[in-house]
């Protein structure tokens, strides 16, 4: 079975009532994904989210480790990744 190059996932921040469909590199590290998400949220909300530096990403029922990649975390097309304040 070939590994996918990209993964289509929905990133949801329910606290701010926003969900973003994203096509992401399968080997993207969770730490880099957090930075990308925070950048998007800051652009939408005009510089807010400075207190979210220590946010966490949740997939299924577990908090994702910063050193994992999307692929190693078991995230596949159609996955929902939740953003939460930690």
Language-model regions, residue ranges each:
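Ubiquitin system architectures
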Residues: 1-86
């Amino acid at each position: 079975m070939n590994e996918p190059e990209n993964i289509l996932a929905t990133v949801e921040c329910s606290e701010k009532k926003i969900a973003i469909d994203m096509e992401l590199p399968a080997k993207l590290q969770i730490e880099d994904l957090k930075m990308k998400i925070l950048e998007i949220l800051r652009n939408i909300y005009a510089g807010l989210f400075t207190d979210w530096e220590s946010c966490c990403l949740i997939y299924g029922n577990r908090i994702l480790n910063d050193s994992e990649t999307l692929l190693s975390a078991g995230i596949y097309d159609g996955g929902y990744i939740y953003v939460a304040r930690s």
